[in-house]
Every structure is written in structure tokens, then in C-alpha cells.
Design a protein with these regions (language model features):
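Non-catalytic, conformational "gating/processing" segments within enzyme and secreted inhibitor domains
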Residues: 165, 218-250, 452-453
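A common structural junction motif
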Residues: 148-156, 250-258, 371-382
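Bacterial N-terminal signal peptides
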Residues: 21-35
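Short, polar/flexible loop-turn hinges at active-site or ligand-entry regions and domain interfaces
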Residues: 99-104, 151-159, 175, 379-383
Length: 482
């Protein structure tokens, strides 16, 4: 199971929020490769779960090594749950949640956390929105009280909403509109999902953000911000009984104000055509090639998902990964190469591959070598050594993840918010151990195919402004492209 990553981060399951979450990805460091796989949990035998009378789910992850707690509230709503024409409202509401209630004026919550020596954050994904604080354990009742208050007590007026909308528009201009790589990533996301709401950016389309208003924010808030649509995760120096008592005294007093329904979204049809995009811009310092494939999430198909986890590690696992070893070390065509897979999603998700050519290498030559490497892997699969190294690396990440209570809280929160369970998280390492070389080869053969792919070229150019346009697939035997 994967923790939230950002996209998100190029997996832009894209976390976007007031602050960027600290744990976006695990970098492969020395290889210059970003393997977009977040840490997993190997064992968490002490995890406790219970549900309050108002329907709020609670997860407690005891960790007594330091007198500190991480307190998170996850709402089962993200950008993919937005009404058509109102993209960005989930992220916009995340901003507005810091604007105050009748009981606590704007900024007071953040000021109190800061005075207590704590940290806070919030982030929005396609499938969830989360808020968290990290404080000394004696301050847990304080942050629980504040968070419970703003669950239903937020005060929104035009004087609050409209200026914050301008803040979001400026955020979009800075992060996306002024960044060629982000523009291309956004276009690729839209090209990948032709029917599913994962197609629109988490921050929203500019023209639709401009039209968001107080009524939109209130309607979204009243529909989705209710205890029976929320998950409380507390990790740290606490006991389950203590958390239950505090949760009942704070969140337990919040009445549910909407009935939750199954999250049924338009699903992506089986893709039938390769899609290719190119963006040329004078601000591009390093050309790059990126390719994403439509694949199942863990919730959609556990067996395939775990095999895809192993595949991403075999292909993109640092300096020993197949792509880095082939394209960078052996052929000398790339300065970097990697792979990632975002398994934590409610619906079908993406598997990604990226590479950057050396200065004297054309991006077309690099792509041909990448195609050959993927085709060879789909034909022959991983070696026994590659498979063992990949599985060992994934399990090691799972063990290391237990050293960070914030990581544990994120992993459990993201899993539960996307339709999986705490048992799924705990069972994931044993599922990895059981993956065979044939399973890894099989998912590569079935999913790393042209019809399921969106390929992008980010190029250097003197042309301004940036322009993105579709590129026709290579007419010379596109069926050989993998």
C-alpha cells in the first residue's frame, strides 16, 4: 500500500494544499532517479479501530518512543468528487478551512499550534482531503477540540471567500501556468482520463476557479464535511482507550449533517489508442520524456497492484533498476531514468516511466531505447536477482516506515480513505513476498502497451509562450512500441 504521493510529485495523485506535505516520494538519491513509491507498513500489530456513534471512523497507531502525537482527520472527498464545472472546489475549501469559526477566529488554530511548538498541514488529493497536527501528547485534546469545531462550524462570507479565491488563482499561476513541466503534466492527465474525473487538475481549471463562490463552498462543505464521512487517525504516544475517550468528548458531539453515499464515478473505458503530447518552451532547462499507463489500483485489483508495485521497483529501483542500468549505465543515452506507481486510489490509476536524455542524444533516440527495454522486459521478465532485490527493497521500506509516526498515520489514512482496510495495509508485505517473476512479467505485458499509454516530450525551444500539441505516433510499425 502506498502513502500519499504527489503528484499529489510526478505521480500527481497530486497533493496540492496550503503547504506541500513532507512525504511526497522516496528519492533514489545517488542514481539521480526518483522512484515514485512511497513507504509501506510492514507490521502494525497494535493498530486499533473503532467507530463513534455519529459514524466517524477512528484508527489508533500507538508509538511510545517519544511523547509526541500525530493527529489527522481525513475526509472521503477529493477533486474527483466535484460537480462538473466546479473543478478546484475541494482544494479551495481546504484553504477556507483555516478561516475561522464562530468559536475561533481566523488564524487562531494555527497560532495555538505554533505556540505549542507543534506543526500543522493540510492537503487535497483526487480521492481525499486531510488535515493534521503534530504536537506533544498533552496537547492532543486541544487540537482535537479545534478540529472538531471546524468540521461543521466554519463561517464563510464573501469577505472571506473572494480574497481566498484570488490566492488560489495565484497559486495556480505559480505552480502550473508558469511551469512548462506542470503544464505538460496537466495536459497528460487530461489525455489519460477521457471519461473519469481524475482528468481535471486538483487545483482546478482557471476559468472554473474564477467562478467559484460562497454558495459553492458552503454546499460542498455541508455535503462532505460530516463525521460519518471522516476518518480520525492518531499515531504516537497514546493508548486506544485514551483516544476513544477524547474522541467521544470532541468529535462524538458533532452531529452528522448528511448521509454518505457510495462514491460512484464515471469509469474510464478500455483505452484503444496511443496518445502523444509535446510541449516546447524556452524556459525548459532539461528535455525529458515521460510515459504513463492506465493500470488498476490496489482497491481495483490487489493481485495486479502488488505485482505492479514490484514491477515499478524492478524498473525504477535506483541505480540497480533495469531502466537506469540500461539507459544510463550501459547505453549512455540518459542522464536519469525511473519508474513509479501510485496504487492508493479509489479507481484506475497510473504507472509512470520517465527519462532525460544526455545533451548529445535526441529524445527520439532515447524513446526508441526505452521502448526496446520495455519490450525486452515484457518478453523475458525480471531475473531472479532483480526480483529478489526488488521485493527486499520494498519490504525494507515497509520496515523503515515504522520509524516515522507521521508516515504511519498517512499510510493508514490514505488507505482507508480510498476504500481499503487496515488489514490490507498490514498484509501488504506478505503479498509482496508472494509475487512471482511470471506475475511481474504478466502485468508488464498486459499494461505497458501503447494503447494504454500517454507519452509526453518536454523540449527546449526559443518559442514563447509555451504551446502544447498532439504528436502523431511513429507510423513505422507503432505496434512495436511498448
Amino acid at each position: 500500500m502506498l502513502a500519499p504521493s504527489s503528484t499529489d510529485a510526478e505521480p500527481d495523485v497530486a497533493v496540492t494544499g496550503r503547504f506541500m506535505p513532507a512525504l511526497m516520494l522516496i528519492a533514489a538519491g545517488a542514481a539521480g532517479l526518483a522512484t515514485m513509491a512511497a513507504p509501506r507498513v510492514a507490521q502494525a500489530t497494535e493498530v486499533s479501530e473503532f467507530t463513534l456513534d455519529n459514524g466517524m471512523q477512528v484508527v489508533v497507531v500507538p508509538d511510545h518512543r517519544a511523547p509526541v502525537v500525530t493527529h489527522m482527520v481525513w475526509y472521503r472527498v477529493g477533486s474527483a468528487d466535484e460537480q462538473a464545472g466546479k473543478s478546484g472546489i475541494a482544494h479551495f475549501l481546504e484553504h477556507l478551512m483555516f478561516k475561522g469559526t464562530d468559536k475561533h477566529p481566523a488564524g487562531e488554530f494555527s497560532q495555538v499550534v505554533s505556540k505549542l511548538g507543534g506543526q500543522e498541514n493540510a492537503f487535497t488529493s483526487t480521492d481525499y482531503t486531510a488535515y493534521f497536527q503534530r504536537v506533544a501528547k498533552e496537547h492532543l485534546p486541544t487540537v482535537m477540540g479545534f478540529e472538531a469545531d471546524r468540521m461543521t462550524g466554519l463561517v464563510l462570507t464573501d469577505e472571506v471567500v473572494l480574497p481566498e479565491r484570488d490566492v488560489v488563482l495565484e497559486e495556480r499561476r505559480m505552480r502550473t501556468d508558469n511551469d512548462p513541466a506542470s503544464q505538460l503534466s496537466e495536459a497528460a492527465q487530461a489525455a489519460m482520463f477521457t471519461n473519469h474525473p481524475y482528468s481535471h487538475p486538483i487545483i482546478g481549471w482557471e476559468d472554473e476557479i474564477k467562478k467559484l463562490n460562497r454558495d459553492d463552498a458552503l454546499a460542498f462543505y455541508r455535503r462532505f464535511y460530516t463525521p460519518n464521512n471522516a476518518i480520525l487517525v492518531v499515531a504516537g504516544d497514546v493508548e486506544p482507550d485514551e483516544v476513544r475517550r477524547l474522541a467521544e468528548a470532541t468529535y462524538g458531539k458533532v452531529a452528522k449533517r448528511a448521509e454518505t453515499a457510495e462514491r460512484i464515478r464515471p469509469q474510464e473505458p478500455t483505452p484503444r489508442a496511443e496518445r502523444r503530447l509535446v510541449l516546447a518552451d524556452g524556459r525548459v532547462a532539461q528535455p525529458s520524456l515521460s510515459r504513463t499507463y492506465l493500470v488498476p489500483s490496489y482497491r481495483g485489483n490487489k493481485e495486479d497492484s502488488v505485482a505492479l508495485d514490484v514491477l515499478s521497483q524492478v524498473l525504477g529501483g535506483g541505480a540497480t533498476g533495469r531502466l537506469y542500468r540500461t539507459l544510463v549505465v550501459e547505453k549512455g543515452l540518459a542522464s536519469s531514468a525511473g519508474a513509479w506507481y501510485q496504487s492508493t486510489a479509489l479507481d484506475d490509476t497510473r504507472f509512470g516511466i520517465s527519462a532525460s536524455p544526455r545533451p548529445d542524444v535526441s529524445i527520439d533516440k532515447l524513446e526508441a531505447a526505452l521502448d526496446a527495454a520495455i519490450a525486452d522486459f515484457a518478453e523475458n521478465g525480471p531475473s531472479a536477482k532483480e526480483l529478489e532485490r526488488a521485493k527486499t527493497g520494498l519490504i525494507a521500506e515497509a520496515i523503515y516506515a515504522q520509524d516515522n509516526q507521521g508516515t504511519l498515520a498517512r499510510i493508514y489514512g490514505a488507505a482507508l480513505a480510498t476504500g481499503t482496510t487496515a488489514d490490507d495495509v498490514k498484509n501488504w508485505p506478505s503479498e509482496v513476498k508472494a509475487v512471482t517473476a511470471e506475475q511481474v512479467r504478466d502485468v508488464a505485458r498486459r499494461f505497458l502497451v501503447p494503447a494504454r499509454a500517454v507519452t509526453t516530450h518536454l523540449l527546449q525551444s526559443k518559442a514563447e509562450p509555451a504551446t502544447a500539441a498532439p504528436v502523431q505516433p511513429d507510423a513505422a510499425a507503432p505496434e512495436k512500441r511498448t
